[in-house]
């Protein structure tokens, strides 16, 4: 038994090391790749200082943090709701952030600065989160809370659709691009949004013990002495914050929060002591690679990153499911 535990521990360490190396390679490639390839030896030349440090680095850091936040949010939701299909958009938090951002674009007639749009997106996500916490205070079961989140998401989606019909052509272009996700407008002015993600990411990665209990189910978690109501509220609030900030940075990006935790579980990473940091590393790597494809796929334009994540990831996910079912 002790030998098996040691073997599992070594395997977990190997997985984390491999994911760390993958993330570093993706980070390096993201800084080098673009319309002009800039090798690390040229990073400190005048051209490198402009393209790498002023343009590519803030974008790369934003992609890394958003990928980590979405993947960890998916892992938290899948444990919290005991549903492998749970992901950041399921509770309506992503759509709530979208409603806040779209309201800011329409009411501000496209004149509001980026920081104001970011605050509105975060406010929309937190409003939906507060509504969910209100439901949670009524001690609803996990399945009912999940259904409440789905209903809120549908309402927010309907509001966004109505907003598109009433928008002008300029606003419509901005809204449609946002709904497909993208990091094209990210620069150092959004650094405050990046910093807002870091403490919550680190805190959640340290909460493996309650997460492991939640993954056992509500009844088992209560029997083990976990204050279920408290942890459910805290985790929903933390997830709402991360998703709101992510939407403010890059718009709506699907697939990462759904598939990354599921893929890692299929690979044997079920302990949240390993799964949570693994999701952060794998989510960051996956979104970095998707962003590189989005930048380089077309010569004259940039693809929406949400389209890239779905196109590249869905076949891999189906293949893994078929492989696991054999």
Swiss-Prot record:
One of its GO terms (molecular function) is identical protein binding. GO terms for cellular component: ATP-binding cassette (ABC) transporter complex; BtuCD complex; cobalamin transport complex; membrane; plasma membrane. The gene is btuC. Pfam families: FecCD (PF01032). The keyword Endoplasmic reticulum does not apply. The chain crosses the membrane at residues 11-35, 57-81, 93-107, 114-138, 142-166, 191-206, 229-249, 258-267, 275-296, 305-324. It is a multi-pass membrane protein. This is Vitamin B12 import system permease protein BtuC. It is found in: Cell inner membrane. The complex is composed of two ATP-binding proteins (BtuD), two transmembrane proteins (BtuC) and a solute-binding protein (BtuF). The keyword Cell membrane applies. Residues 36-56, 108-113, 167-190, 250-257, 297-304 are periplasmic. It comes from Escherichia coli (strain K12). GO terms for biological process: cobalamin transport. Part of the ABC transporter complex BtuCDF involved in vitamin B12 import. Involved in the translocation of the substrate across the membrane. Belongs to the binding-protein-dependent transport system permease family. FecCD subfamily. InterPro entries: ABC_BtuC-like, ABC_transptr_BtuC, ABC_transptr_permease_BtuC.
